[in-house]
Amino acid sequence: MALTKAEMAEHLFETLGINKRVAKEMVEAFFEEIRQALESGEQVKLSGFGNFDLRDKNQRPGRNPKTGEDIPISARRVVTFRPGQKLKSRVEEANAK
């Protein structure tokens, strides 16, 4: 099961007692801030959680799986996420139970 933005907003509503519209706007604003930072080439560091980075990938050879034809995969920039040590530890502890 995946955690959705709607579920995050619902949790804010229940935990903080703010109205649902404000909770939804807060979640949207949070993700928009991350999106804008990455679009402008910035790294996003969330203390205790992890880092979102941009990585440039070079062009490389590929193959069309239907035809077997060799095709180039173009160079592109991708978003990567590296979990922080606290997050890694908590996930490991949760899985150990």
From Swiss-Prot:
Keywords: DNA recombination, DNA-binding, Transcription, Transcription regulation, Translation regulation. Transmembrane segments: none annotated. PROSITE patterns: HISTONE_LIKE (PS00045). CDD domains: IHF_A. This protein is one of the two subunits of integration host factor, a specific DNA-binding protein that functions in genetic recombination as well as in transcriptional and translational control. This is Integration host factor subunit alpha. Heterodimer of an alpha and a beta chain. The gene is ihfA. The keyword Transcription applies. SUPFAM superfamilies: IHF-like DNA-binding proteins (SSF47729). Residues 49-71 are annotated as: Disordered. Belongs to the bacterial histone-like protein family. It comes from the Bacteria. GO terms for molecular function: DNA binding; structural constituent of chromatin. GO terms for cellular component: cytosol. GO terms for biological process: DNA recombination; positive regulation of metabolic process; regulation of DNA-templated transcription; regulation of translation. InterPro entries: Hist_DNA-bd, Histone-like_DNA-bd_CS, IHF-like_DNA-bd_dom_sf, IHF_alpha. The keyword Nucleotide-binding does not apply.
